[in-house]
């Protein structure tokens, strides 16, 4: 970074801090909102990231709305933080305010299967509560780290299911107007790991509404590995599917455990690439493997397995990055992990190495799944 850029950043940060100091009493006066001293390494499942210029913990939807409106009115950059499971944040001082979602009410209506969860609710708590209550439809999404509010933003999915399968609407704070509105799922343009909320900053999800089955059964299973574990495609009791999914995820290091560095990750780091059929044919010809994972993904397009591509490009489970401080998980090539004393720069170096290796081997560009703040791949 040049001296000029460094000086500009220092001036910007001082200016933002001055503005923030001016509205601090107003934020402190908001019910259920409180300033807290915290680093992003403490807020993310990667245990990486520097220090925001301030952090505000919000324990109600109302406090989220009021804090965001106030920060936006004074043009202070902010980052909404829920479970912190899908964030890659730069080292050092980060010139923004972290707004931490701590509103976590979950309401379940058993006779209709309607579920309403506030954005800060732990996602797997939502799944567990629903399955235990005899509702089906989200059991395949068991064990995914993070908060309920993050699930529609990137249309979270696993084991053949996506949140779009059951999402009715989101309660959204529209930042341009400050209005709170109920947005139907159909208006979110939900697609593979995408919604029109992703990367845009246009709104803050305050809550989600889901429609589940009341018979306690899963939908027919669309993921071969899961169907094999359970013996057939089903339907199966949702509680049985949840147990199987948690077992599969744990075996891949995809259930967060603070004591296990294999789970200090952002989950699946790259999305499965959707490419023209000709590219899929090229990859197959390079490896000479007719059993290559390849799935139809619309007219003339196929979806490839990012984990398979990474492995076939020569990056085995446990492949180490700079100084061994980061590595691919020893259980799954798609998870990039902090081995306990890494920096974000270490992680970015490993991500670039893997991405570049896959491009060199197959001509396929892997796209990262997490949200990047202050750093890029």
Curated annotation (Swiss-Prot):
Active site: 193, 268 (proton donor), 369
Entry's EC annotation: 1.3.1.98
Pathway as given in its UniProt record: Cell wall biogenesis; peptidoglycan biosynthesis
Subcellular locations according to the entry: Cytoplasm
Keyword Signal (UniProt): no
Molecular-function annotations in GO: FAD binding; UDP-N-acetylmuramate dehydrogenase activity
Residue pairs linked by disulfide bridges in the UniProt entry: none
Keywords attached to this entry: Cell cycle, Cell division, Cell shape, Cell wall biogenesis/degradation, Cytoplasm, FAD, Flavoprotein, NADP, Oxidoreductase, Peptidoglycan synthesis
GO cellular component: cytosol
Top-rank lineage group of the source organism: Bacteria
Alphabetized SUPFAM superfamilies for the sequence: FAD-binding/transporter-associated domain-like, Uridine diphospho-N-Acetylenolpyruvylglucosamine reductase, MurB, C-terminal domain
Residue stretches making up the FAD-binding PCMH-type domain: 48-215
Known cofactor(s): FAD
Gene3D superfamilies reported in the protein's UniProt record: 3.30.465.10, UDP-N-acetylenolpyruvoylglucosamine reductase, C-terminal domain, Uridine Diphospho-n-acetylenolpyruvylglucosamine Reductase, domain 2
The protein's name in its UniProt record: UDP-N-acetylenolpyruvoylglucosamine reductase
Gene name of this polypeptide: murB
